[in-house]
């Protein structure tokens, strides 16, 4: 079985590798440029941008259905468990569930963690 979560779990790349968890990145847009959280930009980079441009704001968007489909298809021969950020806070759960629906021949379970941040990370760790 392979476990997926989204970058809202705040797992470091090292922790994700240790747990053998695949992290699906949220998209962050700052000053018109979009980054994949934990891939193209990291918290320290965001902090630096915020200090350089204190009047600018970041917008976020959940991973798309296509993001999930692409990753799920890479693991077509494995059972997949996806633990997502709370559906009450984001559309990440909906994206993952829609992707699973599009791949009926794969064994994919999508779980709404109903939480965020370190609490989501702890669920993934257990």
Model-predicted regions and their roles:
Residues 65-96:
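N-terminal glycine-rich phosphate/adenylate-binding segment common to multiple enzyme folds
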Residues 23, 82, 108-110:
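Conserved beta-strand scaffold positions in the cores of enzyme catalytic domains, especially
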Residues 5, 82-86, 112:
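Short beta-strand segments
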Residues 89-126:
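Active-site histidine-anchored catalytic micro-motif
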Residues 40, 58, 62-66, 90-93, ...:
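Electropositive phosphate-/nucleotide-binding environments in soluble metabolic enzymes
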Residues 18, 77, 103-105:
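Short, well-ordered coil/turn elements that cap or connect secondary structure elements
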Residues 2-64:
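N-terminal glycine-rich anion-binding loop in soluble enzyme alpha/beta folds
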């Amino acid at each position: 079985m392979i476990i997926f979560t989204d970058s809202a779990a705040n797992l470091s790349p090292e922790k994700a590798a240790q747990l053998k968890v695949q992290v699906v990145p949220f998209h962050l847009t700052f000053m018109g440029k979009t980054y994949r959280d934990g891939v193209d930009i990291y918290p320290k980079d965001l902090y630096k941008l915020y200090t350089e441009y204190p009047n600018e704001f970041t917008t976020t968007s959940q991973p798309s259905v296509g993001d999930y489909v692409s990753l799920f298809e890479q693991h077509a021969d494995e059972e997949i468990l996806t633990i997502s950020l709370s559906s009450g806070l984001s559309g990440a759960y909906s994206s993952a569930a829609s992707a699973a629906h599009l791949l009926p021949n794969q064994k994919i379970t999508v779980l709404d963690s109903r939480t965020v941040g370190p609490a989501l990370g702890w669920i993934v760790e257990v």
